[in-house]
A protein has these predicted regions:
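Non-catalytic terminal accessory segments
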Residues: 1-73
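Binuclear metal-dependent hydrolase catalytic cores centered on His/Asp/Glu-rich metal-binding motifs
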Residues: 172, 176-179, 191-231, 235, ...
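Core catalytic region of metal-dependent phosphoesterases/phosphodiesterases
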Residues: 103-190
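Conserved beta-sheet core of the metallophosphoesterase superfamily
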Residues: 176, 226-305, 309-310
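Membrane-interface segments at or immediately adjacent to transmembrane helices
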Residues: 41-118
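Beta-strand-turn-beta hairpins that frame and shape the catalytic cleft
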Residues: 73, 79-93, 179-180, 186-199, ...
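Active-site neighborhood of phospho(di)ester-bond hydrolases with catalytic His/Asp-centered motifs
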Residues: 93-96, 123-129, 153-160, 182-185, ...
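Acidic/histidine-rich helix-loop elements
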Residues: 64-70, 95-108, 131-136, 162-165, ...
């Protein structure tokens, strides 16, 4: 979906070119004012939901003089207090939107997944859009097999491109790699770490999360799109992990993403947000799609440390 701001701005420029006389000559300025007003409102709303910045980031450094960032991977580290845990720390690593294909080097995807395991995560979440074309399924299996492992498991949901391509084949590739799909249900983790459940939703393309979320559980939710955040927050979700947006994939320094595939425009384009009682983390993803190029938008791995600093 093209952002409303970009659409209105284009409309203003088009009107300015063709309307030069009469009362309608003011039309371009009215359209431009509407676009600027909408952009200002969206910035206010986004600021209201924005939460913490990463406590640190490791990887390729962003530079104004280096616009092409297609494979400039960065790992972002976040911390959230979670006193209900029975352990001092539960580390979650998230990857999203591999869009794995031969358009990017196989070695890039392998190195990206290896960097996830190198963080010694307790959990790994794979939040959808693993492939975009049927031809890439063998490559997906090659890259995934034997590569991802975490102390308490690796979990995944499918994304819209997975459903549009070959959902059953993607499920089989995930399963063969030892990855557990949580499409509309929950998996309870060992009681030794606390009351923690890992759940998934594949709405609106697949099954919606139907399992009730208990208020006393720490519920970690995989949702390919961040558009589900309002419903999930209302259901009592604790932390939601999403992708889908690619961070816009094409960004302008000082402005941000030009295009974000979300009903809420750029509101949840990338990073950490707080909606209701839920934390939301949105990954920019690892791959790129239409075009297979990133401009001022680095691919990322998100690492969230849920920390109990009150003693266990």
């Amino acid at each position: 979906m093209v952002g409303l701001f970009v659409s209105l701005l284009a409309g203003a420029l088009l009107a300015a070119r063709h309307v030069r006389r009469g009362p309608l000559r003011l039309l371009p300025w009215l359209i431009l004012l509407l676009a600027l007003g909408h952009e200002a409102l969206e910035r206010v709303i986004r600021h209201r939901y924005a939460a913490s910045a990463p406590v640190r980031s490791v990887g390729a450094a962003a530079s104004l003089w280096h616009p092409i960032t297609t494979t400039d991977l960065v790992v972002h580290f976040f911390e959230l207090p979670e006193p209900a845990l029975r352990v001092k720390r539960l580390r979650v690593a998230q990857i999203s939107d591999l869009h794995i294909s031969s358009r990017l080097p196989k070695a890039y995807f392998e190195a990206a997944l290896d960097s996830v395991v190198a963080q010694d995560p307790d959990l790994i979440f794979v939040t959808g859009d693993n492939v975009s074309h049927v031809d890439s399924l063998p490559l997906l299996s090659e890259v995934l097999t034997g590569r991802l492992h975490a102390r308490f498991g690796v979990f995944a949901v499918l994304g819209n491109h997975d459903f549009e391509t070959a959902p059953e084949a993607v499920r089989q590739a995930l399963s063969a790699a030892g990855i557990t799909r949580v499409s509309s249900d929950c998996v309870r983790l060992p009681q030794s770490i606390g009351r923690v459940v890992v759940c998934g939703t594949e709405a609106p393309w697949g099954p919606k999360l139907e399992t009730p979320l208990a208020a006393h559980d720490l519920s970690l939710i995989l949702s390919h799109t961040p558009d589900n955040i309002y419903d999930l927050a209302a259901q009592g979700a604790s932390v939601v992990f999403s992708g889908h947006t690619h961070g816009g994939q094409l960004r302008v320094p000082g402005f941000g993403a030009l295009v974000v595939p979300s009903s809420y425009g750029r509101r949840f384009d990338e990073g950490h947000f707080r909606v209701g009682g839920a934390d939301l983390f949105v990954s920019t993803g690892l791959g790129a799609y239409h075009p297979p190029l990133r401009i001022y938008c680095q691919p990322d791995v998100i690492v969230v440390d849920l920390v109990n600093d009150q003693g266990v």
